[in-house]
Amino acid sequence: MEWKTCSFCEGTIEPGCGKKYVKKDGSVMHFCSSKCEKNFKLGRVGRKLKWTNTFKRINRGQ
């Protein structure tokens, strides 16, 4: 089993945990928590939210 990466916050997902969401166009999204899934469905972008690893990675030097 392999570890996955959350499509919203870039957090790690252990094998057997998380949730998989398949969009109508066939692309697959992996979520580590319901918080990430709900924010994605609301149309929010992970790189603009301070609690995500994506935001922390982009704004590391600032």
Swiss-Prot record:
A zinc finger (C4-type) spans 6-36. Gene3D superfamilies: Ribosomal protein L24e. Binds 1 zinc ion per subunit. Its cofactor is Zn(2+). One of its GO terms (biological process) is translation. InterPro entries: L24e/L24_sf, Ribosomal_eL24, Ribosomal_eL24-rel_arc, Ribosomal_eL24-rel_N, Ribosomal_eL24_CS, TRASH_dom. It comes from the Archaea. Keywords: Metal-binding, Ribonucleoprotein, Ribosomal protein, RNA-binding, rRNA-binding, Zinc, Zinc-finger. Zn(2+) binds at C6, C9, C32, C36. PROSITE patterns: RIBOSOMAL_L24E (PS01073). Signal peptide: none annotated. Belongs to the eukaryotic ribosomal protein eL24 family. Part of the 50S ribosomal subunit. Forms a cluster with proteins L3 and L14. This is Large ribosomal subunit protein eL24.
